[in-house]
Amino acid sequence: VGDIDVDKVEAAVKRIFADIPAPVNPAKREYTEVADNDKPLVSIATDKEASNMVLSIFYKHDKMPKELYATAAGLMKDYMENVVETMINERFAEMMQKADPPFVAAQASDGDFMIAKTKGAFTVAALVKEGEIDKALDALVTETERVKRYGFTASEYDRARINVLKQYESLFNAVSYTH
């Protein structure tokens, strides 16, 4: 968002932080392992100042090792996650077009399990209408189970594939333009 004089900024950073000594024995950064669970875990958090109700369901899974991110396997995993997210989010969007939708908004995504760095999760979440949490929960679980059992149609995949590839092309062009 503008031109930066790299040499000037680097000199300023060195000047500002020069007097801060490096730690002699820095603590090793450790991440707590998140355990799997056999039965669903349920948690309800309330806030009297919150104006919306949000329902989230996390389907935990192991994460891909970091050393594979920048490989063909990492690219394929990223592509598959994006296509699946696009397809299920399109289904949620269609549900919201109905006369009495089960939620105000819904979204699926795959990433870290909450703030954990050691466990991934496929997450479905919805903005819920007052008094309709059961309706929203049923819709989210039903749709994710439908995907698990039956997958997606060829036409859903074709539309999602085209959209995801367009996103990759736009990202590539943006990065190419800036470098």
Annotated model-derived regions:
Residues 1, 51-72, 92-179:
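M16 family metallopeptidases and their MPP-like homologs
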Residues 2-53, 159-173:
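An aromatic/glycine/proline-enriched structural segment found at the starts
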Residues 77, 81, 85:
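Long, His/Glu/Asp-enriched segments that create or flank divalent metal/ion-associated functional microenvironments
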